[in-house]
Amino acid sequence: MKEGMSNNSTTSISQARKAVEQLKMEACMDRVKVSQAASDLLAYCEAHVREDPLIIPVPASENPFREKKFFCTIL
């Protein structure tokens, strides 16, 4: 019975060490305020609006997925 408790204790110590290492890594990361990230994202979207085919459609002549205008009839 004592071995089971020792093994369980070792496992929880190992998990705690991993958690501490993870928290140390996260504490060193640079953080950005949400308002700043949103502002940066908005500026990026506005700067690249002309390249976005969902906002400015691709000209039909350049669209590889356009409908073909050829009709085939079977007689």
UniProtKB/Swiss-Prot annotation:
Membrane topology: Lipid-anchor
S-geranylgeranyl cysteine lipid attachment residues: C72
Keywords: Cell membrane, Lipoprotein, Membrane, Methylation, Prenylation, Transducer
A GO term, aspect molecular function: G-protein beta-subunit binding
Record-level GO cellular component terms: heterotrimeric G-protein complex; synapse
Keyword Translocase belongs to the record: no
Location of Cysteine methyl ester modifications: C72
Single Gene Ontology BP annotation: negative regulation of cell growth
Cross-referenced Pfam families: G-gamma
Location of the protein in the cell: Cell membrane
Pro-peptide positions on chain: 73-75
Top-rank lineage group of the source organism: Eukaryota
Keyword Ribonucleoprotein: no
Tissue: Brain.
Function text: Guanine nucleotide-binding proteins (G proteins) are involved as a modulator or transducer in various transmembrane signaling systems. The beta and gamma chains are required for the GTPase activity, for replacement of GDP by GTP, and for G protein-effector interaction.
Similarity comment: Belongs to the G protein gamma family.
Subunit details: G proteins are composed of 3 units, alpha, beta and gamma. Interacts with beta-1 and beta-2, but not with beta-3. Interacts with KCNK1. Interacts (via C-terminus) with KCNK2/TREK-1 (via N-terminus); this interaction confers ion selectivity to Cl(-) and L-glutamate.
Name of the protein: Guanine nucleotide-binding protein G(I)/G(S)/G(O) subunit gamma-4
Organism per entry: Mus musculus (Mouse)
Lineage: Eukaryota, Metazoa, Chordata, Craniata, Vertebrata
Gene assigned in the entry: Gng4
